[in-house]
């Protein structure tokens, strides 16, 4: 199966470039929904999300040790402005991809508008090496116990090797059910794919423990995770299923300041 994935990347290169992968263990547990538990990496999914702190994450994609994915995100807020810098790196001896981004968002009353500039670099050994600049946009509305966000990745319709990179639309609404629980629902639409429905739940068992779970329809995937909080630090471990591949284990360390 590992060999099949690598061959697929080499033979259908553009379909494997700029994959909409979770950028943290939290998003792995919530199927990519970010409003239910904000973190610095949430800006990658919706540039309007603002959460001050530092977050680093790592995973072996679908439990394949030859496909490590590393993420690093920093976010800072100054008055009504939010600043975010993030990077991800997917490494394999034959396939390398990095994604670096800078995000700026602005909050006015109940609304936040954000935009990201991303630099995408991709190299397939002895086949191609290229890069592209992309722009993402996001909008967030928050009112009491309800928040709603809409984001669009690659609003510039940027090209890679003269072919258009994927455009991803994500809508999400989050509701506070009780003081200790939240529920998020979302719809995701990517170029050349059907709509994907997502639902995620959060329950704060204790001030030191939070449980996350999610379900995604088309394709069917289930995610679960646990967050251990210690003052300003939090450690998240999550696992997510796949219809055809092995489980995707993820770990993240977050420091809030």
Per-segment meaning from a language model:
Residues 3-14:
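Sec-dependent N-terminal signal peptides
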Residues 17-257:
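Subset of outer-membrane beta-barrel
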């Amino acid at each position: 199966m590992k060999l099949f994935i690598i061959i697929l990347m080499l033979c259908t290169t553009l379909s494997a470039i700029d994959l909409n992968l979770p950028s943290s263990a939290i998003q792995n547990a919530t199927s990519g929904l970010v409003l239910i538990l904000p973190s610095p990496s949430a800006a990658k999914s919706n540039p309007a999300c603002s959460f001050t702190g530092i977050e680093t994450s790592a995973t072996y994609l679908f439990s394949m040790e030859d496909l490590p994915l590393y993420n690093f995100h920093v976010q800072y807020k100054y008055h009504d402005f939010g600043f975010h810098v993030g990077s991800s790196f997917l490494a394999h001896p034959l396939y390398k991809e990095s994604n670096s981004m800078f995000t700026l968002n602005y909050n006015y009353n109940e609304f936040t508008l954000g935009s990201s500039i991303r630099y995408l670099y991709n190299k397939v050994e002895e086949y191609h090496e290229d890069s592209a600049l992309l722009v993402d946009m996001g909008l967030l509305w928050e009112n009491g116990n309800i928040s709603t966000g809409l984001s669009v990745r690659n609003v510039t319709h940027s090209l890679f090797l003269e072919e258009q990179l994927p455009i991803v639309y994500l809508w999400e609404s989050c509701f506070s059910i009780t003081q200790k629980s939240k529920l998020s629902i979302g719809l995701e639409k990517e170029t050349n794919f059907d709509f994907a429905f997502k639902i995620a739940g959060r329950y704060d068992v204790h001030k030191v423990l939070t449980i996350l779970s999610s379900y995604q329809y088309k394709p069917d995937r289930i995610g679960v995770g646990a967050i251990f909080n210690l003052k300003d630090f939090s450690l998240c471990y999550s696992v997510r299923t796949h219809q055809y591949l092995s489980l995707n284990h993820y770990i993240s360390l977050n420091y809030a300041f």
